[in-house]
Amino acid sequence: MRKGIHPDYQEVVFMDSATGAKFVAGSTLKPEETIEFEGKTYPLVRVEISSDSHPFYTGKQKFAQADGRIEKFNKKYGISSKN
């Protein structure tokens, strides 16, 4: 690899703004803010949503009600729901 063309790769703490959960991961981001985490000082990146707060990962996701739309479609096109 050529020197001087790749961004610096470093460990960064990502903090979920909603829950306060912190994750250490590698990144090329260079934030100004730092944080003490597990005895070391890391650059800090604040994120709005992470796997700790996203409904898909927390199991609190909501499914859209398709029942009414399916019935409306069947009625519109004269499809009988009986087998």
From Swiss-Prot:
Alphabetical UniProt keywords: Ribonucleoprotein, Ribosomal protein
GO cellular component annotations of the record: ribonucleoprotein complex; ribosome
Coiled-coil residue spans: none
Pfam families, A to Z: Ribosomal_L31
GO MF entries: structural constituent of ribosome
GO terms under biological process: translation
TM helices/strands, residue ranges: none
InterPro entries with a match to the protein in the record: Ribosomal_bL28/bL31-like_sf, Ribosomal_bL31, Ribosomal_bL31_B, Ribosomal_bL31_sf
Protein family per UniProt: Belongs to the bacterial ribosomal protein bL31 family. Type B subfamily.
SUBUNIT field: Part of the 50S ribosomal subunit.
Protein name as it appears in the record: Large ribosomal subunit protein bL31B
Protein source organism: Lactobacillus gasseri (strain ATCC 33323 / DSM 20243 / BCRC 14619 / CIP 102991 / JCM 1131 / KCTC 3163 / NCIMB 11718 / NCTC 13722 / AM63)
Gene designation: rpmE2
